[in-house]
A protein has these predicted regions:
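Asp-box/WD-like beta-propeller blade repeats and closely related beta-sheet repeat scaffolds
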Residues: 123-212, 216-217
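Beta-strand-rich domains and repeat architectures in extracellular enzymes and scaffolds
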Residues: 33-73, 80-105, 109-112
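Bacterial N-terminal signal peptides that target proteins for export
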Residues: 2-18
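Residue-level detector of Asp-centered blade-edge/turn motifs that repeat once per structural unit
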Residues: 45-47, 102-103, 153-155, 216-218
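Short, solvent-exposed loop/turn segments at conserved positions within beta-propeller repeat blades
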Residues: 61-64, 112-115, 166-172
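A short loop-to-beta-strand structural motif that recurs across blades of beta-propeller domains
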Residues: 67-69, 116-118, 174-176
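Bacterial N-terminal signal peptides
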Residues: 15-27
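Blade-loop segments of beta-propeller domains
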Residues: 80-150
Length: 219
């Protein structure tokens, strides 16, 4: 059973009305788009069955909660183009980016306002994902990183970028490692001119700021 997800960094699908319209442009069908994926992830080739959309809760609309929405995108299915499942996570967390683990069995989705990370099992029953864990101690476990932004798959682990810190709430932040099942591993603070932390400086400044992450594999 194959599946794919779209996130704001790679696709404009941000809200329910938007992505329902977007489903109609999957012509003739939804195919895997690997352009934003980690090279450590198992590759998907061919027809997708489902699209997972991590959506923002809106006060006064439905239950008002952030939720993971599953859409059937297989043209051979009787539910093609329809929402087949929704899963609310409780409250509004400023739903933002999401990403698969390297084995694509779990989808990690972050909330910027609450610094929570939600881990969904999308492998056992791809049509009906299950919320299997909520990381609600991200700030404490990471040593002060705030706002989990980008999720990036490593072999057996997930790397999370943070937008800020809980000391001065500025841009200095870190990369935070977890195991695929959500156990904290390590925090790697971004290099500064005062402390490069073993990094090789290639630009003019090292200011400790952090936003996104990509890997340049060397083969």
């Amino acid at each position: 059973m194959k599946h794919v997800f779209y996130r704001p960094g790679c696709s404009p699908l941000r809200a329910l009305g938007t992505f329902l319209t977007a489903v109609s442009v999957f012509s003739p069908a939804a195919w895997a788009d690997e352009t934003c994926q980690s090279p450590y992830m198992a590759k998907i080739i061919g027809q997708e069955d489902f699209v997972y959309v991590w959506t923002l809760g809106v006060e006064g609309l439905g239950d008002g909660q952030d939720k993971l929405v599953t859409i059937d995108v297989n043209p051979g299915s009787p539910n093609y183009g329809k929402i087949v499942h929704t899963l609310s996570v409780g409250g509004r967390n400023e739903a933002h980016h999401s990403g698969f683990t390297d084995d694509r069995k779990y989808l990690w989705a972050g909330g910027l306002d609450t610094s929570k990370i939600f881990i969904f099992d999308v492998h056992t029953d791809p049509a009906q994902p299950k919320l299997v864990k909520t990381i609600d101690r991200f700030v404490a476990e990471s040593g002060g990183v705030v706002g989990p932004h980008t999720t990036y798959a490593l072999p057996g682990r997930m790397m999370i970028t943070g937008l800020s810190n809980n000391k001065d709430h500025g841009g200095r932040s870190a990369l935070v490692e977890y195991t695929n099942d959500g156990k904290y591993v390590a925090t790697h603070w971004m290099p500064t001119d005062e402390n490069l932390r073993g990094a090789k400086k290639s630009g003019k400044y090292a200011d400790g700021y952090n936003y996104d992450v990509r890997v340049l594999p060397r083969r």
